[in-house]
Amino acid sequence: ASMLPLDKCFKASFCGDDSLIYLPKGLEYPDIQATANLVWNFEAKLFRKKYGYFCGKYIIHHANGCIVYPDPLKLISKLGNKSLVGYEHVEEFRISLLDVAHSLFNGAYFHLLDDAIHELFPNAGGCSFVINCLCKYLSDKRLFRSLYIDVSK
C-alpha cells in the first residue's frame, strides 16, 4: 500500500498480506512488482479487474450498491475437512459454513458472480446450480450430515 498513491484511492481494504485498492481508471504503476521485490524482497501483484476479490470473497458492484459473496470454490473445498470428529462437530461446522455463506442465499446477482468467477477462471461454467445445491445442504442439518461418516465409533 505504501507504494501506491492512497490519497488518490477512493476505497481500500487491508488484511494480512491481502489488499484491495480502488483507484481511478487510467493511473499507471508499471514498476510495482519490481519495486516490491527490491524494497521488501517479496512478490507483489497488481491486477486490474472489473470485480474485486478480497480475503476469499468476491465484491460485486451493482446499480444499487454492492454485495459480497464468499468464493463458492473455497466453500466447496472446505467440505473436505478431515479434522471433524463426530456428528456434533459436523453440526458446528455446518453452522459455521452457513454463517459464512449467508449472502449466497440471495441469488439476485448470481449473473454478476458468474462474470466475476469467469474473470479469474475463464473456462468455468455457471455457478447458480452449484450454489443452490450448496445452500440446500448447508440449510438442512440431516442432508449436510449425510456428507460425512461418523468415525468416532
UniProtKB/Swiss-Prot annotation:
InterPro entries: DNA/RNA_pol_sf, RNA-dep_RNA_pol_alsuvir
Keywords: Nucleotidyltransferase, RNA-directed RNA polymerase, Transferase
Family, as annotated: Belongs to the tobamovirus RNA-directed RNA polymerase family.
Function: The replicase large subunit is an RNA-dependent RNA polymerase active in viral RNA replication.
Protein name: Replicase large subunit
Alphabetical GO biological process terms: DNA-templated transcription
Catalytic activity: RNA(n) + a ribonucleoside 5'-triphosphate = RNA(n+1) + diphosphate
One GO MF term: RNA-directed RNA polymerase activity
Provenance organism: Cucumber green mottle mosaic virus (strain watermelon W) (CGMMV)
EC number from the UniProt entry: 2.7.7.48
